[in-house]
Structure formats: C-alpha cells, structure tokens
C-alpha cells in the first residue's frame, strides 16, 4: 500500500512539474512581437506611410536560391529579427519560386517590381521610403540576425 501511495504521489508531482514547464513555454512564445511579411506591395507602402516606416522589399527565389534560403533561415526567420522588424520596417517579399505556385496577380506584381527596380540577382534586399524610392540596396550578409540588423540600421541613417 505504501509503495502504491508513493507511486501516486510521484506521478502527481511529475504532472504538476510538466504542466508548469508547458505554461512557461507559452509565455516565452508570447514575448515575440507580432510580425508579418507582406506580399502586396501597394498595401505595404500605404502601411509604411501610415506608420512612418521604411519598406524592406526582399526579392527571393524561396525554393531554389541557396542564398535566399540561407538569408531566410539565418535572419528573417529568427525571433531577434522579427522583433526588430516589427518595430522598424514594413517587410514585403517578392518571391520567384520554381515549384511553389503563386496567384497570377502576385506573379505579375513581382515581375513588375523586378523590372521597376532593375533586379538581376537573388536575394536582393531594397530599403525603400513609403513612396517606393530606393534608400539602399543590399543582399545576403554573413553573421546572422544581429549583424544583419546592424547592417540595416546603418543603411537607414
């Protein structure tokens, strides 16, 4: 009987510990600011004008360009970058995938943007004012999110 009670007590303690761990994880997830990468350039420019922020326009080949995948994985997908970007830029991706299908409207918009800004290689990252004028042009940078944020800050001055 004592062994049975001891086992029950240990099982109850384990359940409480596991429940406590899960709640801390969800609290951590809530600390990341809301961040959304947009695809509609005109809406992004309007949002940039309203919020007085520059537009970060990323030209990418998300499913075939190795440097694009690396930039997304090392920078754009990190909580550090998402937190910074949520406060400082309106981010838009003009994607040119090989396999993934985009709507005809999105394909047309991305082609028009590529031609308008004279994009010849991927990834190309443009920092624009809210009217769509180029402030700076860059691409992949070594060093992860912290280095990329510092690089973008230097371009925004």
Q: Where in this protein do the model-derived segments appear?
A:
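C-terminal motif of bacterial Sec signal peptides marking the signal peptidase cleavage site
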Residues: 17-20
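Bacterial Sec signal peptide processing site at the extreme N-terminus
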Residues: 23-32
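Thiol-based oxidoreductase modules, predominantly thioredoxin-like and allied folds used
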Residues: 37-38, 81-107
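A short beta-strand-turn-helix
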Residues: 37-55, 85
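Short active-site neighborhood of thiol/selenol oxidoreductases, capturing the structured segment around
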Residues: 51-65
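Typically the conserved alpha-helix immediately C-terminal to a functionally engaged Cys/Sec
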Residues: 68-84
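Non-catalytic, surface beta->alpha helical segment in thiol-disulfide oxidoreductase systems
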Residues: 74, 115-157
């Amino acid at each position: 009987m004592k062994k049975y009670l001891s086992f029950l007590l240990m099982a109850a303690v384990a359940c409480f510990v596991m429940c406590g761990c899960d709640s801390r994880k969800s609290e951590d997830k809530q600390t990341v600011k809301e961040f959304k990468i947009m695809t509609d350039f005109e809406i992004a420019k309007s949002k940039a004008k309203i919020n007085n922020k520059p537009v970060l326009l990323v030209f990418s080949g998300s499913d075939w360009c190795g440097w694009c995948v690396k930039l997304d994985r090392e920078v754009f997908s990190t909580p550090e970058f998402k937190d910074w970007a949520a406060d400082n830029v309106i981010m838009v991706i003009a994607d040119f995938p090989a396999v993934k299908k985009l709507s005809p409207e999105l394909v047309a918009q991305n082609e028009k943007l590529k031609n308008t800004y004279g994009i010849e290689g991927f990834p190309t990252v443009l920092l624009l004012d809210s009217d769509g004028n180029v402030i700076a042009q860059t691409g992949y940078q070594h060093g992860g999110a912290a280095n990329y944020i510092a690089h973008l800050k230097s371009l925004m001055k």
